[in-house]
Amino acid sequence: LRLDFEDGYGNRPDDEEDRDAAQVAALLPALLADPHGPFLAGIRFKSLERPTRRRGLRTLDLVVSGMLAAGPLPAGFLVTLPKVTSVDQVTAMVAVCQELERVHDLPDGTLRFEIQIETTQAILGAGGTATVAGMIGAAGSRCIALHYGTFDYSAACGVAASQQSLAHPVADHAKAVMQVAAAGTGVRLS
């Protein structure tokens, strides 16, 4: 389960998103402690692209800080890194996780994430390489999953909205590249 601060949430005034991040920080520990709840839960924050980077990182910090203010970070907490366009963004996400761990005195490797594949650049780089394989490598043990974003990826490929689905050939291609990139790494596909 991911509580969405990205496309589904939209752009809100900072004070409103701050309040919502605080509410999510209060909700997640109880949700993850519930034996009938999800085994993984967290947030999808705004991307690391320049227009949304500051807001996304602030939301991530507020959620992590808020949960830690109430107690230990719950097992099963996970964040989704959306709209990744380059290996550099994954490297930056690793640095963000390391800094949050340092600031909050958490053991190295505590914070984990999934990479949401919803841009064409994440599948095929300008040099013809499968960028997603480099993303997995850059994340190291922090990346536990790749998540395919059907609608954004299909739109980026020029697929009409009425034709966007997991069954479209562009989705088949992207998912096949993701599967090959993740093979043998322990990174799961979702």
Language-model-derived ranges and their functions:
Residues L1-S190:
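Conserved alpha/beta-domain cores
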